């Protein structure tokens, strides 16, 4: 395995101090900023209108504010009759105002890092939608030692052959130079009380209505068969995290307005929902979808690794204004557009910054 020394950076003292400042800013931002969410997938989607006609649409933004455009770059909105029609575009300033008004703008964390050695993953069914992927396959994708995928799908008349190697656990082992090998216990699926629309439908502001309720119900449903106290690794009275994979598609990759946008948030300290199990409070959670809207196969590890990186304490790094003026790492960063690389099956590993942030890498300073 490659050693940290092979990746050491020789940088000047001033650069080292700047990196430390950037890291501090990111840490502080975790205490007063939004729920973290995977960005919208940018590939075009063919939408069938109520009259049978089809249009190509492109999704932009993230959980806090997102919008659709057509091939000409014009903004679209879905009217009450179900038709997508051209509407007035918002300015960059208006987009940021909408994002700041999101009810999930506040997240509270007592500590910046959460390197939990063990965590719970709950598979969730809805009353109108259930898992098509086996629990064994999901467990292998997250924890398998020699996990591989090999499949072919057709999209817009063209066939794509996908191959990949490595589970989510292997991803974090590699990203940490072997210093972090999370134990992810997969349970379920369990069925929550309502249809997906109840939790995932967008409100007037464009935000999902009640995904936190799904989290609370899922934890209560597995309480009889799970000892949640074993997931409070630092014994602070809070379960370190809970991750939910819900049946069906997600909104970020075009699943529709009634589906849930993958994200990480705080159930108790931000959403205000108290869920106490085995004497422990559920707070930090993350969630993602089972199925990929483009391939029609189950998702790869990309979205999981993105959202789980938020569980560990890392922030989003993607551009949010939609005008392309802010240059970011794009597909080269797991915290940007990287979760979608190779259709979500081969996300990029952590950069030197993320490894430094997590304490897995120490730059060498030139004197």
List the predicted regions and their residue ranges.
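Extracellular hydrolytic enzyme modules, especially secreted metalloproteases
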Residues: 241-243, 247-367
């Amino acid at each position: 395995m490659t050693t940290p020394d092979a990746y050491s950076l020789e940088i000047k003292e001033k650069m080292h101090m700047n990196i430390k400042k950037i890291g501090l800013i990111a840490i502080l931002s975790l205490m007063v900023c939004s729920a973290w969410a995977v960005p919208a997938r940018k590939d075009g989607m063919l939408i069938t209108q109520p009259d049978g006609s089809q249009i190509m649409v492109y999704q932009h933004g993230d959980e806090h504010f997102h919008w659709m455009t057509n091939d000409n770059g014009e903004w679209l909105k879905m009217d009450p009759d179900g038709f997508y029609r051209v509407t007035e575009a918002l300015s960059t300033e208006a987009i940021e105002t909408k994002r700041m008004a999101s009810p999930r703008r506040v997240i509270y964390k007592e500590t910046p890092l959460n390197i939990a050695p063990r965590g719970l993953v709950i598979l969730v069914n809805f009353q109108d939608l259930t898992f098509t992927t086996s629990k064994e396959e999901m467990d292998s994708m997250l924890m398998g030692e020699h996990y591989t995928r090999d499949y072919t799908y057709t999209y817009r008349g063209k066939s794509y052959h996908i191959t990949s190697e490595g589970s989510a656990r292997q991803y974090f082992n590699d990203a940490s130079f072997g210093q972090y090998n999370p134990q992810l216990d997969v349970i379920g699926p369990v069925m929550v009380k309502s249809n997906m629309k109840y939790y995932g439908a967008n409100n007037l502001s464009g935000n999902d209505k009640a995904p936190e309720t799904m989290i609370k119900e899922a934890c209560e449903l597995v309480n009889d068969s799970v000892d949640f106290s074993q997931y409070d690794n630092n014994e602070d009275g809070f379960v370190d995290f809970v991750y939910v994979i819900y049946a069906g598609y997600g909104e970020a990759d075009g699943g529709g307005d009634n589906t849930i946008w993958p994200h990480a948030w705080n159930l108790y300290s931000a959403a205000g929902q108290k869920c106490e199990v085995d004497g422990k409070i559920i707070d930090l959670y993350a969630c993602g979808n089972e199925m990929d809207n483009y391939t029609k196969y189950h998702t790869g590890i990309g979205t999981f690794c993105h959202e789980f990186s938020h569980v560990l304490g890392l922030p989003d790094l993607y551009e949010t204004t939609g005008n392309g003026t802010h240059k970011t790492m794009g597909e080269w960063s797991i915290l940007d557009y990287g979760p979608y690389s190779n259709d979500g099956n081969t996300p990029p590993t952590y950069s030197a910054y993320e490894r430094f942030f997590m304490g897995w890498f120490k730059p060498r300073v030139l004197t």
